């Protein structure tokens, strides 16, 4: 795939038409338009329906990527917080719709975001269409000259097998099955090859929902500094998993399965404990640069390990502790390292 593909289109995103899914949550129509720079009439369109948790996951993924780009001149857009009460009110639905639309439009001028695998995955399953061509076809097609009899018309029995087969093909539209050409069309719209802007960032797959708010600077609650017992809590988390808060990631919105088979303590917890223990020692000794790196490494290990953790309760605990460690790392950067030369 050519690296120039990322410059071939102008992108335009809209989020509209909120509706209630049969399962009870709200979903939004997301439309991505790709307008060719060479031919403005060459417009491709992808439409998908997404819920709040999908947008929130994408926000966390893109926030992580944006932070690694070190683009300090632009502020990554905020996203509405999850809430238990009032999430079906018109004002909340509109706030979420606008937040999702602002997020997508923010990516337009940043190649590392608008060509990211996370954004491509977000639109996976949507059909790539050419709305202008469909509109032109509607004007040039002549009206049918002979009315088609209904399917239960007794005259159908008098048709020859070949005629019946041809008539049924006209009456029953056949949806094209997922095919490689459709996937290739999506690949052409989202050029996921590495760009110069993102070349310094380590390669990683899309974040899971468990990683959602941890790298999102707008999703952490303000509060007191982390407790000095963080490491002890992390080391004993497998014992306390039954007592951890198990509130759902999107309150009242998703169906989660509980897994009671925890098994032995995951290795990633032990590794993260060692890293964060050393980070606490470095911070106490005034070695703030080493402490900052230690917290970041510890959080990275937690986020890599938590998706495969068999205990949902422990996953929630890991997410909360990782958020605290990341917040502590940001405090060290702000209080002790912000004045250092680049």
Curated annotation (Swiss-Prot):
Gene Ontology CC annotations of this record: cytoplasmic vesicle membrane; cytosol; intracellular membrane-bounded organelle; membrane; nucleolus; plasma membrane
Residues modified as Phosphoserine are 201, 227
Give me the ranges of the annotated region Disordered: 245-267
**Subcellular localization, as worded in the UniProt entry:** Cytoplasm; Membrane; Cytoplasmic vesicle membrane
Membrane topology category: Peripheral membrane protein
Location of Omega-N-methylarginine modifications? 105
Q: Does the keyword Iron apply?
A: no
Q: Where does a 1,2-diacyl-sn-glycero-3-phospho-(1D-myo-inositol-3-phosphate) bind?
A: 51, 53, 87, 96
GO term, biological process aspect, one: intracellular protein transport
Q: Which superkingdom is the protein from?
A: Eukaryota
Principal subcellular localization? cytoplasm
Q: Which residues form the MIT domain?
A: 265-342
Q: Which Pfam families match?
A: MIT, PX
TM region(s), chain numbering: none
Describe, from its UniProt entry, the tissues in which this protein is expressed.
Widely expressed.
Role of this protein:
May be involved in several stages of intracellular trafficking. Overexpression of SNX15 disrupts the normal trafficking of proteins from the plasma membrane to recycling endosomes or the TGN.
Assembly and oligomerization: Homodimer. Interacts with SNX1, SNX2 and SNX4.
Entry's free-text remark on domains: The PX domain mediates interaction with membranes enriched in phosphatidylinositol 3-phosphate.
Q: Give the family, as the similarity comment puts it.
A: Belongs to the sorting nexin family.
Q: What is this protein called?
A: Sorting nexin-15
Q: Which organism is it from?
A: Homo sapiens
> What does the organism's lineage look like at the top?
Eukaryota, Metazoa, Chordata, Craniata, Vertebrata
Q: Which gene encodes it?
A: SNX15
């Amino acid at each position: 795939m050519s690296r120039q593909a990322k410059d071939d289109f102008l992108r335009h995103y809209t989020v509209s038409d909120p509706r209630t899914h049969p399962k009870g949550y709200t979903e939004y129509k997301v439309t991505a338009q790709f307008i060719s720079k060479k031919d403005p009439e060459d417009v491709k369109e992808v439409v998908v329906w997404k819920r709040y948790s999908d947008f929130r996951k994408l926000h966390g993924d893109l926030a992580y990527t944006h932070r690694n780009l070190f683009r300090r001149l632009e502020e990554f857009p905020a996203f509405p917080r999850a809430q238990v009460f009032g999430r079906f009110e018109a004002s909340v639905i509109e706030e979420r719709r606008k937040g999702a639309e602002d997020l997508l439009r923010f990516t337009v001028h940043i190649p590392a975001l608008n060509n990211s695998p996370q954004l491509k995955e977000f639109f996976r399953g949507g059909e790539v269409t050419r709305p202008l061509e469909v509109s032109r076809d509607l004007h040039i097609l002549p009206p049918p000259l002979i009315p088609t009899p209904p399917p239960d018309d007794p005259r159908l029995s008098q048709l020859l097998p070949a005629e019946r087969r041809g008539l049924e093909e006209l009456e029953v539209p056949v949806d094209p099955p997922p095919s490689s050409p459709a996937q290739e069309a999506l690949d052409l719209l989202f050029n996921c090859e590495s760009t110069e802007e993102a070349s310094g960032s380590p390669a990683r797959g899309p974040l899971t929902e468990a990683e959602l708010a941890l790298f999102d600077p707008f999703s952490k609650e303000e509060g007191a500094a982390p407790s000095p017992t963080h490491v002890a809590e992390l080391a004993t988390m497998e014992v306390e998993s039954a007592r951890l808060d198990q509130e759902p990631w999107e309150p009242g919105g998703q169906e989660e399965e509980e897994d009671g088979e925890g098994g032995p303590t995951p290795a990633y917890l032990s590794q993260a404990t060692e890293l964060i223990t050393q980070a606490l020692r470095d911070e106490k000794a005034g070695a703030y640069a080493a402490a900052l790196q230690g917290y970041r490494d510890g959080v990275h290990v937690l986020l890599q390990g938590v998706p495969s953790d068999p205990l949902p309760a422990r996953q929630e605990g890991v997410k909360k502790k990782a958020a605290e460690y990341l917040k502590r790392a940001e405090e060290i950067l702000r209080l002790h390292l912000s004045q250092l030369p680049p």
